[in-house]
């Protein structure tokens, strides 16, 4: 692949940020199934849209309908799933978007690989640290029940490990407080970090 050369864009990161009125970033929501990642990311997306900011939500289930529909849930397939999503998120970041990625992404090494794809401060890890007992009691898709019955093997949190972030930029337990206050915490972080205007 020595013949493949990266094409440099004529538009810079700072020019895209100036046009959009905010900096791009990847907010990576990680946590157990049922933790509230997609709900929280979706509510943040709605708030950013209300403010006239440019964002897009990449959801774990949705990408498996297209981009990653050929992948299963083996360790290798999970790694490839996160690699692909990381590359897509990087492209969206390059376009100047606030990319909201909601994936269980149970392995710390894979999340760190995505972080390494982008510049300093462009990857914001949001650990949705809702306890397993709460996630299992919610069980919106019936997955925990199936995993406990042995119908799903290698299910994160039950028969497969989840490696919690060591130093996430934000930690939110969705069983504490309400959705509005949790979104406000995310927005405050983005404002204080200079990603979006107040």
Curated annotation (Swiss-Prot):
Gene3D superfamilies referenced in this protein's UniProt entry, alphabetically: P-loop containing nucleotide triphosphate hydrolases
Top enzyme class: transferase
Keywords: ATP-binding, Kinase, Nucleotide-binding, Phosphoprotein, Transferase
A GO term, aspect molecular function: adenylylsulfate kinase activity
Annotated metabolic or biological route of this protein: Sulfur metabolism; hydrogen sulfide biosynthesis; sulfite from sulfate: step 2/3
Residues annotated as catalytic: 105
The protein's Enzyme Commission number: 2.7.1.25
InterPro entries, alphabetized: APS_kinase, P-loop_NTPase
Cystine residue pairs: none
Catalytic activity: adenosine 5'-phosphosulfate + ATP = 3'-phosphoadenylyl sulfate + ADP + H(+)
Pfam families attached to this UniProt entry: APS_kinase
GO biological process: hydrogen sulfide biosynthetic process; sulfate assimilation
UniProt-annotated binding residues for ATP: 31-38
Domain of life of the source: Bacteria
Family annotation (PANTHER family): ADENYLYL-SULFATE KINASE 1, CHLOROPLASTIC, BIFUNCTIONAL 3'-PHOSPHOADENOSINE 5'-PHOSPHOSULFATE SYNTHASE
HAMAP family per UniProt: Adenylyl_sulf_kinase
NCBIfam families tied to this protein: apsK, PRK03846.1
Function field: Catalyzes the synthesis of activated sulfate.
Family indicated by similarity: Belongs to the APS kinase family.
Protein name per UniProt: Adenylyl-sulfate kinase
Lineage of the species this protein comes from: Bacteria, Pseudomonadati, Pseudomonadota, Gammaproteobacteria, Alteromonadales
Protein's gene: cysC
